[in-house]
Amino acid sequence: MAKDIDWGNLPFSYMETSKSFVATWKDGAWDEGTLTSDHTITISECACVLQYAQTCFEGLKAYTTSDGKVVTFRPDLNAERMESSCKRLEMPVFPKDKFVQAVIDVVKANLDYVPPYGSGATLYIRPFMFGSNAVIGVKPATEFQFRILVTPVGPYFKGGVKPIKVRISDRDRAAPHGTGDIKAGLNYAMSLYNIVDAHNCGYAENMYTDPATHTYIEETGGANILFVDKEGTLLTPKSDSILPSITRRSLITVARDILGMKVEERRINKNELEGFVECGLCGTAAVISPIGQVDDHEKSIKFPSGMEEIGPVMKKLRETLTGIQMGTVKGPEGWVVEIK
């Protein structure tokens, strides 16, 4: 029985649900993990996560499909990406098979909170891990919690698929040879000042360039970037400091193998933007959000697709991927995992 929620007007914000999942690493091993209705966490004031930001997270969604099934999208890739984050941050890896099963179990325990098909809302799934024991010198924790919370959410950007305006930031999202390619909490803490400043200046997001030369486009604070050139080629920036987006990876497959598009992953100089016809953000939260204008200090780059409608290529990509997720378009084997 679905909850009495105004699904069509949900904000992108946290709502407490029935159950979360929690597992604990102690004495060199994970316990079995369990579902819990306690959504609070009690830790030492000197916990490693509070003192030294030893934490990473993931993001994925559960959906109701056109035929009434509840599914999630490629959770195995979230497990693999979290493994990379954990290794980089000196944290224990939560096994891939247990990660996927925990996702299934926590969604199953919160089926009342999965929005109905066609509502535009989804159940956001947030796996995360943190160092939980007290640490006063700079060193890794020895005890950890792996948790998964879920919450129903509306669109990430209020306008849905209406184009947004972004700016090229003077600040860096990540350091060269740093942690830009993992989903570490510290990366997002670094972007908070920038995103608040961007919003205060009338922009939806910051577009970051490479930290070494500030010449090549990388990504925004919370999503990867896509471009379309005049020949209809899908372009995406290539860099070692970009988070490997599962949505971007999926869109590249959709473009190349389903829509028959040419795809290039390469370094993209910011001076090339004026020659592109479409631009968009992609990620779990936004799927694809079109960009209509990029401001680079005094210069404004306005894409031919405009500020009113999503461009035709981005629209087709978005419709195809969301169609696969919602069960109206046949996708590659194993992409959609049914919750049953």
Give, region by region, the residue ranges found by the protein language model:
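Helix-start/capping segments and mature chain N-termini
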Residues: 1-106, 128, 135-340
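Extended, Lys/Arg-enriched charged tracts that mediate electrostatic binding to polyanionic substrates
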Residues: 116-130
